[in-house]
Structure formats: C-alpha cells, structure tokens
Amino acid sequence: MKLITEEISNVKIITEGKGSNKKLYIEGVFLQGNLKNRNGRMYPMETLSREVSRYNEAFVQKGRALGELGHPDGPTVNLDRVSHKITSLTQEGSNFRGKAQILNTPMGKIASSLLDEGVMLGVSSRGVGSLKEDRGGIKVVGEDFMLATAADIVADPSAPDAFVSGIMEGKEWIW
C-alpha cells in the first residue's frame, strides 16, 4: 500500500468565545471525490464516502480525530506533533467540509501564531491504500483506502479546492 496525501488550501479561520474561553478553528473543504486532481489521482465517491463515514464514527464522534502541523513520515498520528482536533466532517456534494479546533499544544500554538500573523495555511489529508491506473492515465484510489487523518495543517497551500502533490507522495507503506 502507498501513503496517499492530498492538499487543499481554501480554509477559513474562526474564533469562537471571548477572553480566556476563546477557541480558534479552521474550516473548509478537507476532501474531494470524483475529481481528477492535479497529481492525476481520483477518489471514487463510494470509496471516500464509506471511509469518511468510518472515520467519523471511529474518530470524530469520539474526540480522537487529530491532525498534525506538517506531514509526518508515516500514516500514524504522532501525539507530540498534534496541532488540532477535527470536530466535524460532512459531505456537501462531492466535497467533504471539515472543521478543526486548534489545540493548546506546542504545535497548535505555532499554528495559531501563524494564523494570527496572517499566514495562509492549507490542509492535507493522509491515508493508505492502493492506486490503479485507468485507461486515461488517472490513478484511481482503491477500495482498500483508509483515512489516517482528514487534515494535517501544511505550509504550501494550493489553489482553492485544488489537490497538489503532498510531501509524502510515492512513499511505500505496509499496513
């Protein structure tokens, strides 16, 4: 299986609450299906919907959907690099919109500081699965795809709603 990463940039910054109860969130399109992205991959909606449903049940609803600042070298979430917790992930057509709370962790503080200073950050999904090239040269993500995290925070955002190569592109992983 391959580590598969995708990057999207159009995220909105939201601050909720006042004073010491203030919480910072990012929100936007985290995943897209049935669309050939710029690195030639396509996630079938059936596969993506099934996996997002599993991810929501196993992680989001239980407060375990964590993401990191930057991309790590593997599919597992490293607690020492966690910057945010994904609080919602819902389907809107072929897009999956997400919302994530920036946490009061060392990496969360860095992300918060960057956002406060006006740095445009993107989000990038991370998962493992197989790729099969179709007749048109599109790499179709296989039914064995498993989402590791719906969103890591990354420094190199692409154009709005566009996928670009993740930094872990092409690395081989055994699940």
Enumerate the predicted regions with their spans.
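Amphipathic interaction/junction segments at domain boundaries or subunit interfaces
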Residues: 57-76
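Polar/acidic, low-complexity leader/linker segments enriched in S/T/G and N/D
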Residues: 1-62
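Residue microenvironments linked to proteolytic maturation
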Residues: 3, 12-28, 65-68, 78, ...
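Generic low-complexity segments that are intrinsically disordered, proline-rich and/or Lys/Arg-biased
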Residues: 45, 73-76, 158
